[in-house]
């Protein structure tokens, strides 16, 4: 049985383009069956993260808007 692990990237306090740049760097080191959990409070991330994932062929499997931040689970 395969288990899926999450790599958490907390970019709260960072503004565009830093959340996407940190995501891109994390993706370079991802292993099979790992997902990335990106936490951000950058208002532009609602557009930037899905756009980046779409361009690169990555899938956002979950997207939540919390009170003070957004959360994305990304499958690469």
Ranges and model annotations:
Residues 10, 43-44, 72:
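Intrinsically disordered, low-complexity regions of eukaryotic proteins
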Residues 50-76:
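C-terminal structural segments of small proteins and small subunits
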Residues 22-58:
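Amphipathic, hydrophobic secondary-structure cores in small proteins
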Residues 1-30:
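An N-terminal amphipathic alpha-helical segment
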Residues 6, 35-37, 69-71:
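Intrinsic-disorder/low-complexity, polar/charged segments enriched in Ser/Thr/Lys/Arg/Asp/Glu/Gln
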Residues 10, 39, 63-64:
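Solvent-exposed beta-strand sheet faces enriched in polar/charged residues
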């Amino acid at each position: 049985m395969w288990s899926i692990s999450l790599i958490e990237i907390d970019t709260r306090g960072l503004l565009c383009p830093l959340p996407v740049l940190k995501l891109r760097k994390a993706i370079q080191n991802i292993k099979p069956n790992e997902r990335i959990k990106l936490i951000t409070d950058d208002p532009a991330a609602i557009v930037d993260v899905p756009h980046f994932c779409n361009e690169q062929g990555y899938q956002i499997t979950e997207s939540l808007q919390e009170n003070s931040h957004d959360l994305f689970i990304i499958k690469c």
